[in-house]
Amino acid sequence: MATKDLTFEQAMEKLEGIVSKLEEGDVPLEKAIEYYQEGMNLSKLCSEKLNHVQDKMVQIMNEQGELEPFDIQEDSSS
C-alpha cells in the first residue's frame, strides 16, 4: 500500500514503529536515514489529514443540508 493510501491511524502506527526503531539506537546510519525520510513523509501525511479534518469540522450543515461555515460566538447579552 502506498503511503498516500494509508489511513491516519495506519500512518501513525507506522510512524510510531519508526520512532521506536530509531530510539533503540542500533540502526545502521543508512537505514536510519531511510527511516527518517519515511517518518517525515508519514508525518506530513498525518498533518495533511488532520488539516483536512479540521477544515471539515469548521463547517456545519444548514437546514437545506448544505455545508456552511461554523462560527462559534458567545452571546454577549446573557
Curated annotation (Swiss-Prot):
Family annotation (Pfam families): Exonuc_VII_S (PF02609)
GO MF: exodeoxyribonuclease VII activity
The reaction(s) this protein catalyses: Exonucleolytic cleavage in either 5'- to 3'- or 3'- to 5'-direction to yield nucleoside 5'-phosphates
InterPro entries: Exonuc_VII_S, Exonuc_VII_ssu_sf
Main localization, broad class: cytoplasm
Subcellular location: Cytoplasm
One GO term of the biological process aspect: DNA catabolic process
Keywords: Cytoplasm, Exonuclease, Hydrolase, Nuclease
Keyword Hydrolase appears in the UniProt entry: yes
The protein's assembly and partners: Heterooligomer composed of large and small subunits.
Protein name in UniProt: Exodeoxyribonuclease 7 small subunit
Gene name of the record: xseB
